[in-house]
Structures are given as structure tokens and as C-alpha cells.
């Protein structure tokens, strides 16, 4: 296994409910040359998830649509929810790695457009639900899940006002690619139970720090200490940020920050 599986249980379900296993992945950044990563993705079916959630950046190459669909093939037979990230819309372009340590000035150097409409169509054909500025009520093992999402906040495509409102069902979850504070605060105001995000790569390059490691950046306004894993502030929603599986073709490395997927098991309270 060339990645880390982050596993955690959360007591969010009503008493007497069956456990729900959620596979959360993000930032695959797939290209035709990512053979090891593709093999890891195909192995996830053995985790036997009840629900699959992707928080975007599936693609990193104009010929990656078929690659991604092949890698995800068996998972697409399961219930799935997804949103997109900036690299699903545009081919990555070179950026000075040191620029990630500076304050974001809002400028985006975008590459050529990717065939995201084709990819989106194929995902929906297989039954996965697009939550880019959309909301859906799904039922998993008898539990009604109010799921809402936003398009990529890094490109300012998020329109949470279109999905806001009192939560319905047994639990409410949010899905977004880049965990900007405006999105997280809006979801907290709606009293969601759990939010899934990606984008940060866990910092991608981390420094050893008192028995662990520390991120230097999140590439958004999320505090560095929340760059990966499950965290919570006071009574706000639990936030699971995936450090992701891949990386930009122009920065093909991870330092003290392994690729990862998350298996979150929702259990009764």
C-alpha cells in the first residue's frame, strides 16, 4: 500500500442505527502515468464502504478522464457524492512552490480547459450525485442524509446561498473542495454535523514537529493546524480535510506528508 488510510469513528447516528462506512478521497490529480496511484484507488473497493465521497481535483491531464473512470470503476457501483476542484476545470500550470508560502493575492494562472463536462456526465450515468452548488437527500442503510455542497471556492465558484437552509433528515453533511472560511462558516451556521474537504494536500511539504509534523500552508485561509485529518472547533461541524492522493505534475513530491484516503465510520450516539 503506497498511501496512508486514516480511520476514525464518529458517533453521529441515531440510537439503534447500523454503522455507515464513508470512504473520503480527494486530489487524485490523475494522469496516464500514475500507475501506482491507480492501483491504490482500485484497492479501495476492499474497504467495503457504504458511501463514497470525493472532494475534487480528480484530474491533472487532458487525457485523464478515461484514466479516472477506469480507476474508479468498481467504486462507481456504490452510492457516491462529489464536487470539483480547480484542476478538474483547467490543466495545472507551473507555479513557484515558494509562492504557496505567501499570502494569496487572488490571482489565478489557469491552464487550458479540461473536458470536465464529459467526466461529469459519466459519473452521473453511473449514479453518483454532483453536489457542486447542489443539495440532495439520500438514504444509506435506512439513514436519511441531507447532503449539500459547493463548487470550488478557490476559483470563487462557490454559491452556498443556493443550498443553505435548515437541515433535514437524520444527519446533515457538507462537501466542498477548498475549505475556505466563508464556506465553513456558512455550513456551521446551518448546523451541519460533518463537512468534507480537500485542496490542502495536507501542506504537501511538512516539517517534523514534536513527535509529528507541521504544515507550512493550506493554500487557502484555513489555519495550518487543520490542513489534514478530522478536527472540530467548539460546537461547529466536524471537519475532515483529506491530504489527498496526488500532486501537481510540476511538484511531484510529498515530504513528511504521505498520500492518504479516509475511512470514516458513522456510529450511533
Provide a role label for each language-model segment.
Residues 58-61, 86-90, 138, 152-155, ...:
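Solvent-exposed loop/turn segments at secondary-structure junctions
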Amino acid at each position: 500500500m503506497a498511501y496512508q488510510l486514516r480511520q476514525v469513528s464518529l458517533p453521529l447516528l441515531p440510537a439503534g442505527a447500523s454503522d455507515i462506512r464513508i470512504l473520503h478521497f480527494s486530489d487524485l490529480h490523475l494522469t496516464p502515468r500514475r500507475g501506482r496511484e491507480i492501483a491504490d484507488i482500485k484497492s479501495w473497493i476492499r474497504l467495503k464502504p457504504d458511501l463514497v465521497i470525493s472532494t475534487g481535483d480528480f484530474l491533472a491531464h487532458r487525457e485523464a478522464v478515461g484514466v479516472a473512470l477506469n480507476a474508479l470503476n468498481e467504486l462507481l457501483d456504490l452510492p457516491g457524492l462529489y464536487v470539483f476542484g480547480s484542476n478538474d476545470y483547467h490543466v495545472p500550470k507551473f507555479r513557484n512552490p515558494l509562492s504557496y508560502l505567501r499570502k494569496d493575492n487572488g490571482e489565478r494562472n489557469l491552464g487550458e480547459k479540461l473536458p470536465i463536462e464529459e467526466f461529469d456526465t459519466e459519473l452521473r450515468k453511473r449514479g453518483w450525485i454532483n453536489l457542486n452548488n447542489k443539495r440532495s437527500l439520500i438514504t444509506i442503510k435506512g439513514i436519511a442524509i441531507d447532503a449539500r455542497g459547493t463548487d470550488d471556492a478557490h476559483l470563487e465558484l462557490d454559491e452556498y446561498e443556493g443550498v443553505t437552509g435548515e437541515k433535514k433528515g437524520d444527519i446533515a453533511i457538507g462537501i466542498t473542495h477548498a475549505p475556505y472560511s466563508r464556506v465553513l462558516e456558512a455550513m456551521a451556521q446551518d448546523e451541519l454535523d460533518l463537512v468534507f474537504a480537500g485542496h490542502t494536500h495536507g501542506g504537501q511539504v511538512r516539517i517534523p514537529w514534536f513527535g509529528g509534523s507541521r504544515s507550512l500552508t493550506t493554500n487557502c485561509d484555513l489555519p495550518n493546524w487543520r490542513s489534514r485529518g478530522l478536527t472540530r472547533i467548539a460546537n461547529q461541524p466536524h471537519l475532515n480535510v483529506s491530504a489527498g492522493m496526488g500532486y501537481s505534475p510540476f511538484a511531484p513530491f510529498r515530504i513528511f506528508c504521505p498520500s492518504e484516503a479516509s475511512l470514516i465510520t458513522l456510529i450511533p450516539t
